[in-house]
Structure formats: structure tokens, C-alpha cells
């Protein structure tokens, strides 16, 4: 999802998203109000921040800014995973493969995300699924990254 699509999704969830001058964070959520740092340079980067903040809305409760607390770190992980799935998802990785993306830069461009966010998503997927996972007729390997389309033989 690109930034505009995420803004629409946030609106449909009843969330109010505003771009504001922030220091110390790229995005913050309080209740149903999301603030995105106004001076973030690219729409792709803003979309990554917004996806994570929507993830916080859907999965977190309370103030989790203190990442020294185990429960705060768990909530942060859940919110990021939700954001990765919303913004990229396993199907997004397959779509990038089908579109002929040959490297991380091309995949990030195709998925309208930053390379760093894509790397973090793949690390998170690796932690969740292990070395690989199967989606429909595809095997997605996370280390090293590869997508393989399985062809079934006709009997």
C-alpha cells in the first residue's frame, strides 16, 4: 500500500492522521490520532511510518515508548509485524518477484517502501517463519532471499 492508500485505510478505521513537526519520533499515536513527522522527505518513508502507527492502533495499548520494558518491546514487535504485513506482506514479496524485481532496491521501488523497511520486514518474517515459508504455489526463502514458483505436474 502506498501513502495515499494507507491514509484511506486509516480514515476507514476512524483514525485521524496529521503531518506535524515532531522531534525524536517519526510517528506517534494517541487514541485514534496519528501524527507523522512533517519533514519526512519521501512518500515511501511516510507510508512505512504510517503502516507501523496503524499497527500500534490495532495491536498495542498504553504508552510503550520505554523499550526497556519487555511488554513494551513485545507490543512494538506486534505493531511492526502488523505494519509490515499491511505495507508489504508475503504476497507483496511474491508480486515483486513476478514483476521481475532482481534486487532489494527494485523490490523497494516496486513495493513503494524504503530499502531499510523492506530489510526489516524480511528479518521479521525470517524470525517468524524460519528459513522459508510456503504461500500458495510459492516458496519464499528469507536467508538468502529467494522466491521459487512451484509448478505442479499434471497427472
Where does each model-flagged region fall?
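Active-site hotspot residues in diverse enzymes, especially metal/ion-binding acidic/histidine motifs
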Residues: 1-49, 54-155
Amino acid at each position: 500500500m502506498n501513502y495515499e492508500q494507507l491514509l484511506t485505510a486509516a480514515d476507514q478505521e476512524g483514525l485521524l492522521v496529521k503531518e506535524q513537526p515532531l522531534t525524536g519520533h517519526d510517528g506517534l499515536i494517541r487514541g485514534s490520532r496519528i501524527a507523522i513527522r512533517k519533514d519526512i522527505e519521501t512518500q515511501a518513508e511516510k507510508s512505512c511510518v504510517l503502516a507501523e502507527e496503524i499497527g500500534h492502533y490495532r495491536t498495542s495499548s498504553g504508552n510503550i515508548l520505554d523499550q526497556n520494558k519487555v511488554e513494551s518491546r513485545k507490543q512494538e514487535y506486534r505493531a511492526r509485524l502488523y505494519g509490515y504485513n499491511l505495507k508489504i506482506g508475503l504476497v507483496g514479496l511474491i508480486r515483486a518477484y513476478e514483476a521481475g524485481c532482481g534486487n532489494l532496491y527494485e523490490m523497494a521501488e516496486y513495493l513503494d517502501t524504503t530499502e531499510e523497511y523492506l530489510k526489516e520486514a524480511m528479518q521479521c518474517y525470517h524470525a517468524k517463519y524460519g528459513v522459508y515459508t510456503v504461500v500458495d504455489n510459492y516458496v519464499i526463502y528469507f536467508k538468502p532471499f529467494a522466491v521459487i514458483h512451484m509448478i505442479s505436474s499434471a497427472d
